């Protein structure tokens, strides 16, 4: 997938906002078939006091509100970290076509058969390093 510079910068900015708000620094963008920005989301479980406050779910909710439909056929998700099981289930139900992620999860989920087209993004090494450094710094500060 070819990701334009504006979306890359937005993802970096959003991850930094999450980090500065003491949230796990994950960002998510939803784009249409042409790669145009539709919605964004960051983790906000602590500030929202809501277990559903994952970047992917927040981006999906914003996209649904923007387009006026819960069906997101024809849309793709770009996320800084591979989605968890909960997010995978919501992604599947929302019918998002493709999920592209920069960093793979380090933990194995329980549900490995989710029938979602997930692809780790090739290249973009600077962005991968950026997201990894934010996540590492966040968790190092928690220890």
Label every model-predicted segment.
Residues 47-57:
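A short, polar/charged loop-to-alpha-helix boundary motif
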Residues 1-21, 83, 89-143:
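Zinc-dependent deaminase
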Residues 39-45:
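Short beta->alpha transition motifs characteristic of CBS
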Residues 24, 71-73, 95:
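Short loop/turn motifs at secondary-structure junctions
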Residues 39, 56-65:
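Glycine/small-residue-rich phosphate/adenosyl-binding loop
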Residues 69-81:
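Immediate flanking context of iron-sulfur cluster ligation sites
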Residues 26-35:
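Short beta-strand scaffold segments in enzyme catalytic cores
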Residues 68-69, 113:
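Short secondary-structure boundary/capping segments
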